[in-house]
Amino acid sequence: MNIQCKRVYDPAEQSDGYRILVDRLWPRGIKKTDLALDEWDKEITPSTELRKAFHGEVVDYATFREQYLAELAQHEQEGKRLADIAKKQPLTLLYSAKNTTQNHALVLADWLRSL
C-alpha cells in the first residue's frame, strides 16, 4: 500500500497518483481551479472541535491523535474505500498544515495502512 502525505502548496507530481485533499476547509491562497486533485474528502477530516482544540494548543499531539483515531473509527467504510485505492495506485493525502511532522494527514495515513 503506497500512501504519502504532501502539503497542498508543494507541486503535484505524476508519482502522486490519486490526490485527495483531507482538510475540512479549503487551503488559503489557492484557487479551486489551481489545485490538482482527484477529490476533496471532508468526511474523514478531524471534527471542527478537535481541529480547533489542536490548532489552539488546547490539546497536545498525542491527545489529538488519540481523539482523531476515535473519530476515524466511525468512518471505517470510507477508510476502506481509500485503502482500496492505495492498494491499486499511489495515494497522496493533501493537507495545508505548516507542521509536517505532527498533523492529521499523518494520523490518517497510519490509520489507512492499518485497515
UniProtKB/Swiss-Prot annotation:
InterPro entries: YeaO-like. Pfam families: DUF488-N3i (PF22752). To M.tuberculosis Rv3073c. This is Uncharacterized protein YeaO.
